[in-house]
Amino acid sequence: MTKSELIERLAGQQSHVPAKAVEDAVKEMLEHMAATLADGERIEIRGFGSFSLHYRAPRVGRNPKTGDKVELDGKYVPHFKPGKELRDRANIYG
């Protein structure tokens, strides 16, 4: 599901709320989540999961075109860990 599809589905379920208000709310929520992670904070949504940053250590990679070795710097990457309720709901299809 894309962000546009999410907005469309939520707007369809909330007929009393204008679609533009739903779009603004979704965009604001995602922006706030990104800013929170950028500040190094963890986000926990009970029953759904948690978002945090994981550190990737510096390493030697390879240029896929030339095969040359490339030094890659260490960096933080977003990480999502699903909560138990979400894992259980997803496993009904597995």
UniProtKB/Swiss-Prot annotation:
Keywords of the record: DNA recombination, DNA-binding, Transcription, Transcription regulation, Translation regulation
Cellular component terms per the entry's GO annotation: chromosome; cytosol
InterPro entries: Hist_DNA-bd (IPR000119), Histone-like_DNA-bd_CS (IPR020816), IHF-like_DNA-bd_dom_sf (IPR010992), IHF_beta (IPR005685)
Pfam families, per database record: Bac_DNA_binding (PF00216)
GO molecular function, one term: DNA binding
Gene Ontology terms: biological process: DNA recombination; regulation of DNA-templated transcription; regulation of translation
PROSITE patterns: HISTONE_LIKE (PS00045)
Entry's transmembrane regions: none
Source organism superkingdom: Bacteria
UniProt family annotation: Belongs to the bacterial histone-like protein family.
Known function: This protein is one of the two subunits of integration host factor, a specific DNA-binding protein that functions in genetic recombination as well as in transcriptional and translational control.
PANTHER family: DNA-BINDING PROTEIN HU, INTEGRATION HOST FACTOR SUBUNIT BETA
Quaternary structure (record): Heterodimer of an alpha and a beta chain.
The protein, known as: Integration host factor subunit beta
Lineage of the species this protein comes from: Bacteria, Pseudomonadati, Pseudomonadota, Gammaproteobacteria, Enterobacterales
